[in-house]
Every structure is written in C-alpha cells, then in structure tokens.
Amino acid sequence: MINLGDKQSIIVVAMSGGVDSAAVAAMLHAQGYNVIGITLQLYDHGMAVGKKNACCAGQDIYDAKMVANKLGIPHYVLDYESKFKESVIENFVDSYLQGETPLPCVQCNKSVKFKDLIKTAKELGAAQLATGHYVRKINGDNGAELHIGIDPAKDQSYFLFTTTKEQLDYLSFPLGWFTKDETRKLASKFGLEVANKPDSQDICFVPDGNYKNVINKIRPGSSKKGKIIHVNGFELGEHSGIINYTIGQRRGLGIAYNEPLYVIKIDPNNNIVYVGPESALNMQEFIIKDVNWLADEIKDNEKLEVAVKIRSTRLPSLAEISKLGDDKMKVKFLSEEKAVAPGQACVIYDGERVLGGGWITRDIIITL
C-alpha cells in the first residue's frame, strides 16, 4: 500500500506508455486517489510512429491513452516538441560537438519531465506528481531524501541526480519498493495490456540508433575530418569527425599499430582525437560542474568520503570530494579508474542515498 496522503487529493501520474507508469496509475487509482494521467509528446510524431521500444513515441502515447481509458481516469497529451528540441536534442548535439559523451535522459528529466510536468501538475491542483522511476523517496531528519530502488538491476537514481530538493518534496516514486517482475505482475493483475511490453532501450529521438544522422541533420557539416595523434605526440592517421568517438573507445579507429589503442582525449577546439594504450585511460582526479546537492552543505575546506558512479552501468567507486566554488567539486578516486568521459554524470552516494551529482568536465582528466 502506497500512502500519498489524503485520498481526495489529485495525483498526476507521468504516463510514458510503458508498464511502469501504467502500474503506478492503476495502483493509485485502485487505492482511491483522484488520478490524472499526463503524457508528453516530445518529438516529431511521424518519426515517433515508426520507432518501437523508445520512450514517448507515437505507439507509447496510444498505449498510455488505452491504459487511462481502461482505468477510467482523465488523460492529457501535451505537446512539448519545441521545448524538447531546444533543451534536449540540441544540447545532445552540441555536447558531441564539444567532444563529450552526452546523457540526454538526464537532461530530459531535468529540463522537461520534472520541471514542466511539475508546473502542469500544480496548475491542475495536484498534491503530488507520481512517476514510474525505480528510486525511493524517504523522509529523513532534514526532509525528503532520494535513495536507490530496492531492485539494483532497475535502479534509476543515476538519471535523477539533478532533481532539486523542492522537486523531491513534490514527487512520488511508488515503484522504488518494487522489483520489475513485481511491477509486471501488478500490471497483469489490473488487466493492463502493457504488462508484458518491452522496456524502452534506445534514445527516443534517434530512430535507427544512429545518433550521427541526428547530429548532421541538426548541425550540417559536423563530421569534419582531423588528426589522430598518439598521446606521446606523433600523428597516426586521420579521423572521420570527433562526433564518431568517445573516451575509452577501441573499435573503429582504423589505425594499425603494435598495441591496442584507445581514445584517451578529444580536443574539439583543434579537431584532434588523441589515442594511446589502455593504461593512459587511468586517472584519479577530475572536476564536476553544475553540481546539484541534496544533502547537508559541504564546508569550503571539508573533504567527504563517498561512493561515486561515473556511468549508469558501473558499480560505485570510493572517492573523496571537496567543493570548488558554488557549483563545482573536485572528485578524487581512492584507486584509479578508467575512461572518465566528459559529458557523463558523476553521481555521489552515501550508502543507498543520493547526495547529489554533477557533470564531468575535461579539466585535469589528462595533461598532454
């Protein structure tokens, strides 16, 4: 039983068309809450119709509507294409052009799904906005805290580190206490056709998985050839455009050499891709920017031992963090890590609690 307060309250559910948000809507409706479903149309409908297994595609909008009809709850589709293009797609493209490896799902949660959905939910008089994310909101001594979901295979806390304290107070994550199998069983119990619908896998606005086509469409002429240089300083060949490379990449370099080579650094200003041996990927310190902090404030000279994740699929690593001004932090691993990629998120944990996070910069990752 999920307790969201007064049963007469309006609860807006962000319905993506998948099984998770459908199960949330059905569960809250069954418990007597006044549920309203909202689905965002985020990109070109023609593209969406042809795209399967992606969040907020045309089929997903239809599926969300069918779930709402079955439950007998109001459902609205809001057109956020222009906002999504500006805040997410163009940010994604420009990040690649800066030699970064972007994380568009985090930008979408930050700039569109939470920010704008919360605004809409409040305009509808809702007491809370509920989503199908696998994270937990726990009331601590100093207010709401963001914790990992109990199902480690589905935990989505890495993608929600930009959630502010004010947003967290208004949000609800009922599925943080469920495993994926339990969610599907719940959806089946309510007779929802999406109970066995596959999870979304791809970036929603990349219809064929080829992000380079999207970049070249938004920013024509982006694939400019340039030099591939070894970290020791000698030229090895020519690259096909920095958008085709990411830190740690080994395959597709097109270079014959006497040892395996990896992408070590991308220099967008000079259009250079630096490569080197795997050992050159090792590093211990880096800087994160645009830090969002959900815990007690860190003092200027304080060093805090934490666990950090630098990729959604990696296990947390022990590190020490310290402040660098208002919105930056220095992160120092206790042991060296490989392939820390600018543009990715560094999310900071204390056990199961999310303390905050920021965006990895190229500062002091490597000095050539």
Curated annotation (Swiss-Prot):
Marked site: Interaction with tRNA: H133, Q344
Annotated InterPro entries: MnmA-like, MnmA-like_C, MnmA-like_central, MnmA-like_central_sf, Rossmann-like_a/b/a_fold
Record-linked Pfam families: tRNA_Me_trans (PF03054), tRNA_Me_trans_C (PF20258), tRNA_Me_trans_M (PF20259)
This protein's record includes keyword RNA-binding: yes
Coiled-coil stretches: none
S-S bridge residues: C108-C204
Keyword line: ATP-binding, Cytoplasm, Disulfide bond, Nucleotide-binding, RNA-binding, Transferase, tRNA processing, tRNA-binding
Positions of the UniProt region annotated as Interaction with tRNA: 154-156
SUPFAM superfamilies from the UniProt entry: Adenine nucleotide alpha hydrolases-like
Catalysed reaction equations from the record: S-sulfanyl-L-cysteinyl-[protein] + uridine(34) in tRNA + AH2 + ATP = 2-thiouridine(34) in tRNA + L-cysteinyl-[protein] + A + AMP + diphosphate + H(+)
Transmembrane helix among keywords: no
BP GO terms, sorted: tRNA wobble position uridine thiolation
Molecular function GO labels: ATP binding; tRNA binding; tRNA-uridine 2-sulfurtransferase activity
Primary localisation category: cytoplasm
Subcellular location as annotated: Cytoplasm
EC number: 2.8.1.13
Annotated positions binding ATP: A14, M15, S16, G17, G18, V19, D20, S21, L40, G132
HAMAP family: tRNA_thiouridyl_MnmA
Function comment: Catalyzes the 2-thiolation of uridine at the wobble position (U34) of tRNA, leading to the formation of s(2)U34.
Similarity comment text for this entry: Belongs to the MnmA/TRMU family.
Protein name: tRNA-specific 2-thiouridylase MnmA
Source species: Rickettsia canadensis (strain McKiel)
